[in-house]
């Protein structure tokens, strides 16, 4: 790990455990080397660091371009493997950025829903992740996060609440899984990934 990434990793882990009683299960399913997609449900700004501390090695993320316009914040997040995406241009920009990262052998975090949930429930999948899988055929690790909505909901305040991250078994795809290079085919694959995430249960 790069020094700043290692520092943020350690700090995030400490805060997650002390403030949010963070727990993780299924970490043996994580692909720690080579290109892979970490696909998770999205409820909160806490989700990226929670996924980050669940994995042993560095991950790469996409972040809104506007965040990089703030000099200090932009400098910080770029040093912890965040890349800017212009959301005003739609999913295409994000898809291209992620494909480039995967082709370089990096492991990236993707939220199939595309944005944070307003009520904590899993939303409808967008076709972007399906397109990325079709173009790269990299393995996908489904991850479900529990409790981050209660800890920091969209538009709400941050507060202590237990969070749990559960990692499912990797999914692998071949060309035959795709009916064609079209939006409908990509959407079906995206829905398969999101269904795998939704099927993950929190251990009692």
Model-derived segments and their meaning:
Residues 1-23:
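N-terminal membrane-anchoring alpha-helices
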Residues 3-4, 93-204:
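Non-catalytic C-terminal accessory region of glycerolipid acyltransferases
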Residues 10, 17-18, 30-89, 97:
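Catalytic core of membrane glycerolipid acyltransferases/transacylases, capturing the structured
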Residues 17-25, 89, 146-149:
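Short gly/ser/thr-rich secondary-structure transition/capping motifs
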Residues 21, 35, 162-164:
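A residue-level signal for beta-strand positions that form part of recognition/binding surfaces
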Residues 22-24, 82, 140, 165:
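Generic structural signal for residues in well-ordered beta-strands
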Residues 23-24, 29, 168-171:
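A short N-terminal beta-strand-loop micro-motif at the entrance of redox/enzyme domains
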Residues 28-31, 157-158:
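A short beta-turn/loop motif at secondary-structure boundaries
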């Amino acid at each position: 790990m790069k020094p700043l990434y290692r520092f943020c990793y350690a700090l995030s882990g400490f805060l997650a455990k002390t403030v949010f009683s963070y727990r993780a299960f299924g970490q043996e399913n994580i692909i720690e080397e080579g290109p892979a997609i970490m696909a998770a449900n999205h409820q909160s700004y806490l989700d990226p660091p929670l996924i980050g501390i669940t994995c042993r090695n560095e991950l790469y993320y996409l972040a809104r371009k506007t965040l990089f316009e703030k000099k200090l914040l932009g400098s910080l997040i770029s040093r912890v493997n965040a890349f800017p995406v212009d959301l005003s241009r739609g999913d295409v920009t994000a898809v291209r950025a992620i494909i480039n990262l995967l082709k370089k052998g990096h492991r990236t975090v993707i939220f199939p829903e595309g944005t944070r949930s307003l009520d904590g429930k899993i939303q409808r999948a967008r076709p972007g992740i399906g397109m990325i899988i079709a173009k790269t055929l990299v393995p996908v690790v489904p991850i479900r996060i529990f409790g981050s909505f209660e800890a920091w909901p969209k538009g709400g305040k941050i507060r202590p609440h237990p969070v749990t991250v559960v990692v499912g078994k990797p999914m692998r795809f071949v060309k035959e899984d795709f009916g064609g290079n079209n939006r409908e085919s990509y959407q079906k694959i995206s829905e398969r990934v999101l269904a795998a995430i939704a099927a993950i249960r929190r251990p009692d």
